[in-house]
Amino acid sequence: MTNLTLALDAMGGDFGPRITVPASLQALRLNPLLKIVLVGDKTQIDEYIASAEPAIKRRIEIKHTTEVVAMSDRPVHALRNRKQSSMRLAIELVRDGKAQACLSAGNTGALMAMSKVLLKTLPGIDRPALVSCLPAVNNTPVYLLDLGANISCDSETLFQFAVMGSVLCETVDKTVSPKVALLNVGIEEIKGNDQVQQAGQLLQQIPQINYTGFIEGDEIYSGNVDVIVCDGFVGNITLKTSEGIARLLIHQLKKSLSDGFFVKILAKIIAPRIRSLLNQMNPDHYNGASLIGLRGIVVKSHGCADEAAFLQAITLAVTEAQRRLPQMIEDRLESILLDINS
């Protein structure tokens, strides 16, 4: 394992340095080969690193700027007018080869726009996709993409997403020949719109991708597939609905376990199992969405992430950098395109 540098937008998200900096310190303690460049207001950042151990401080660099991309900024406005923002400067560090990955909890649209313009897409990729993992019944994650980077997609774009999702699953989770499916309104070949049907036909012609066909929404968490592909409109609604249901279940479970004396006693006895279950259901446990298809690594954290959730996103960015995800995607796509054209 070699040293690597992470560029971190310290000002992004709902809480800024109050969450991003302590999480960074935790990551540095866990990984002695990691260096982090904190991009943002030095005065605010210094407040949270003042008490850190000297050995940790030596692996922190601060790139000062007071400009921030607001959550209300439109992507085009941010791209044109936030050229000294903490988000943009963090991405530029990746572009210039001074960092191997970038992480931000800021404005998603602005992050996608800046990343695409500054880092460019890989050869053979038309659009980057936002991807994250969801829990499944067999305790293995299922990757869902796109989560909102592309509201509408043609069949070729969905095909490219399937290739990238497959490589991501292979690279991060070491899954051999991951099963890939297209999210649809039915499993029959006649179901769905033209884009989904045509994407399915394209994938059937590619033996390097383990395409299993269509999958319906009620099978997302079944564990029967490893990668699920859809356009960003469907994916974003699916993700947000899933997070809402998970929080509802956690709330209801906690409420049920606090009703009545004997129930409370039972809850204390089985507390470790309950905590494990709640952790598996908690959306924060899966924090971190990757913007894949770019020439560099960009990870998006939830804006409302707490310290533990933000640490999870840092871990994801580090893992993708260690395993050279963009290069893996480029190599696999080149191999597939060569086979198609031969």
Curated annotation (Swiss-Prot):
Main location: cytoplasm
Keyword terms, alphabetized: Cytoplasm, Lipid biosynthesis, Lipid metabolism, Phospholipid biosynthesis, Phospholipid metabolism, Transferase
Gene3D superfamilies per the UniProt record, alphabetical: Isopropylmalate Dehydrogenase (3.40.718.10)
Catalytic reactions of this protein: a fatty acyl-[ACP] + phosphate = an acyl phosphate + holo-[ACP]
MF (Gene Ontology): phosphate:acyl-[acyl carrier protein] acyltransferase activity
Pfam family, one: FA_synthesis
GO cellular component, as recorded: cytoplasm
Highest taxon of the lineage: Bacteria
InterPro entries, alphabetized: FA_synthesis, Phospholipid_synth_PlsX-like
Tagged with keyword Cytoplasm: yes
EC main group: transferase
Pathway: Lipid metabolism; phospholipid metabolism
EC number: 2.3.1.274
GO process annotations (BP): fatty acid biosynthetic process; phospholipid biosynthetic process
Subcellular location, record wording: Cytoplasm
Protein role: Catalyzes the reversible formation of acyl-phosphate (acyl-PO(4)) from acyl-[acyl-carrier-protein] (acyl-ACP). This enzyme utilizes acyl-ACP as fatty acyl donor, but not acyl-CoA.
Subunit and interaction comment: Homodimer. Probably interacts with PlsY.
Family indicated by similarity: Belongs to the PlsX family.
HAMAP family: PlsX
Name of the protein in question: Phosphate acyltransferase
Protein's organism: Shewanella pealeana (strain ATCC 700345 / ANG-SQ1)
